[in-house]
């Protein structure tokens, strides 16, 4: 019986450790407030539909919230697996973010059906 409890504990630890393995650190370059496809003024006058906030665990925009299930950084690129909550229901997908020299970030989904440029808002 003790062996079963030990095994359950090990499986639980492995699952919780694996689930957080792809989390983004608090100082990661991808995090912050952005606008999509238009330069950000950051003075409150940016269109609501263009605003995007990326935190350590999710992307929040007017169309919905996408939670990071996994994130793998590779230099100036981050490949993510997300679950998005939309009014029509949940959707899972893969998104790649690429940091550009001009301080913008390219955003593209796996199937290349949606691309965008994210402009960082001044703090």
Go through each PLM region and give its residues:
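N-terminal glycine/threonine-rich, aromatic-flanked beta-hairpin/loop signature
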Residues: 42-83
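Bacterial N-terminal signal peptides
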Residues: 6-14
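Beta-sheet ligand-binding and adhesion/scaffold domains
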Residues: 81-123
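Processing junctions and N-termini across compartments
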Residues: 15, 33-34, 60, 78, ...
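N-terminal helix-cap/turn-to-beta initiation motif at the start of protein domains
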Residues: 20-33, 122
């Amino acid at each position: 019986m003790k062996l079963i409890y030990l095994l359950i504990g090990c499986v639980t630890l492995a699952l919780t450790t694996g689930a957080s393995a792809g989390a983004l650190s608090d100082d990661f370059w991808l995090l912050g407030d952005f606008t999509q496809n238009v330069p950000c003024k950051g003075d409150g006058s940016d269109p609501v539909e263009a605003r995007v906030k990326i935190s350590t665990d999710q992307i929040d925009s007017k169309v919905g919230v996408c939670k990071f299930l996994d994130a793998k950084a590779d230099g100036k690129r981050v490949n993510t697996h997300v679950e998005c909550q939309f009014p029509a229901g949940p959707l899972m997908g893969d998104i790649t973010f690429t940091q550009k020299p001009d301080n913008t970030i390219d955003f593209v989904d796996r199937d290349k059906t949606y691309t965008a440029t994210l402009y960082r808002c001044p703090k």
